[in-house]
Amino acid sequence: MAKQSMKAREVKRIKLAKKFYSRREHLKSIISDLSVLEQDRWKAVLKLQTFPRDSSPIRQRNRCSQTGRPHAFLRKFGLSRIKVREAAMRGEIPGLKKSSW
């Protein structure tokens, strides 16, 4: 189990990313638009740097919904490999069975 503080940190990152999404996208479009004056683009870069680090969606980490484990996360199920295996062995995931050949 992940610490509660780590889970809370991820929730905070998600909330910040949603809050700053439109502002970040607007500034990033100004930065990448070559028809805008260089001085204005530079101001947009400086403004973007004033935003909190955690407002960037890149800093979010996928975590297991049951345990909070950050590694071996399977997107399809929203669980770590360990919890997927446990659920599959109990037959809780429809259509998933242990392979045999």
Swiss-Prot record:
GO biological process: translation
Keywords assigned by UniProt, alphabetized: Ribonucleoprotein, Ribosomal protein, RNA-binding, rRNA-binding
Pfam families: Ribosomal_S14
A GO MF label: rRNA binding
SUPFAM superfamilies per record: Glucocorticoid receptor-like (DNA-binding domain)
Residues that span the membrane, as ranges: none
GO CC field: cytoplasm; small ribosomal subunit
Subunit description: Part of the 30S ribosomal subunit. Contacts proteins S3 and S10.
Family classification: Belongs to the universal ribosomal protein uS14 family.
Database matches in HAMAP family: Ribosomal_uS14_1
Protein role: Binds 16S rRNA, required for the assembly of 30S particles and may also be responsible for determining the conformation of the 16S rRNA at the A site.
Name listed for the protein in its UniProt record: Small ribosomal subunit protein uS14
Organism of this sequence: Buchnera aphidicola subsp. Baizongia pistaciae (strain Bp)
Classification lineage: Bacteria, Pseudomonadati, Pseudomonadota, Gammaproteobacteria, Enterobacterales
